Amino acid sequence: NGVRSRMCMQPNEEDLCTIYHELGHVYYYLWYKDLPPLFQNGAHDGFHEAIGDTVNLSVTPQYLHGLGLVSAVKPSREAVINQQMKMASEKIAFLPFGKVIDEWRWKVFSGEITPAHYNEAWWKLRTQYQGVAPPVPRTEADFDPGSKYHVPANTPYTRYFLSFIIQFQFQKALCEAAGFKGPLHECSIFGSKAAGERFAAMLKLGQSEPWQDTMEKLTGTRQMDAAAILEYFQPLQAWLAEQSKGQTCGW
C-alpha cells in the first residue's frame, strides 16, 4: 500500500532527505497501528525522530548514484572527508545545542535558574557547551531562549538529542543485518530484506514494551551509547587529529 505526504518542496537534496525522514514517521505509525491505542507511539520520545534519521543515513552518495540522481564520485580521502564534514555539521554540531535546551528548561523548573537570570543562564550554557556568545550585548530585558519554538511551547527537546545518539546504533545494527562489511559511513540498507525485517520487528512493538526491550530487539543492547557515532565518523576524527596536531582546541 502506498502512502502520501503533502508538502511544499523543491527538487533538492534537503527536501529529498526530508521526505525520507517523514516517511520514517509514517511507516512507524503503520507498523504499530494495530496495537491498542495506548501503545501507538515510539518506544521512547527519541525513537520516532531516530527512525526517519536512520533511513537518511542510508542515503549515501553511492545510493544516490544508483538512483541516477548524482554522478559517480571517484573514491578518495578528500571526498570522504568532505561528506563526513557535511554530516558532522548536521549530526555532531547539533548535540550540544540539543542538550542546552532541556538543561536550561529543567533548571528553570527546579528553581536553580530564577526569572532574574533567565537570559544570563541561557548564554552561560550556550558558551559552556557550544562555545558561542551573543553577537551583541544582552540583558535580562531580553529573552533569547524564547526564540526557540520549543521553549515557549513547553515542548521537551531531549527527544531530539537522544535520537541523534540512537539513530547510529540503529544504523549499525541494520548494516550488520544486511551483511554489509565495509565502513559504517558507506553502508546503505536500501534493498536489504533482512535489514527491513529486523527493522520492522522493532517498529511493530510501538510503545508496548519498555524501551530497553524494544532497543534490544534491534541492536542487541539495552543501553544508549555513542560508540556507533564514533565509528561512523572515524575517518573525520583521524583527519581532524592530523590537522589539529600541536594545537590547543576548545574555549
Predicted features by range, described:
Residues 2-4, 30-69:
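Catalytic or ion-translocation cores adjacent to nucleophile or general acid/base/metal-coordination motifs
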Residues 6, 33-34, 145, 206:
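Short, hydrophobic/aliphatic alpha-helical segments
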Residues 16-20, 27-28, 46, 54-58, ...:
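C-terminal, non-catalytic "cap/extension" segments appended to globular domains
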Residues 1-2, 153:
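Catalytic zinc-binding patch centered on the HExxH motif and its immediate surroundings
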Residues 2-20:
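Short pre-active-site segment immediately N-terminal to the catalytic Zn-binding motif
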Residues 7-10, 39, 88, 154:
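Short coil/turn segments at secondary-structure junctions
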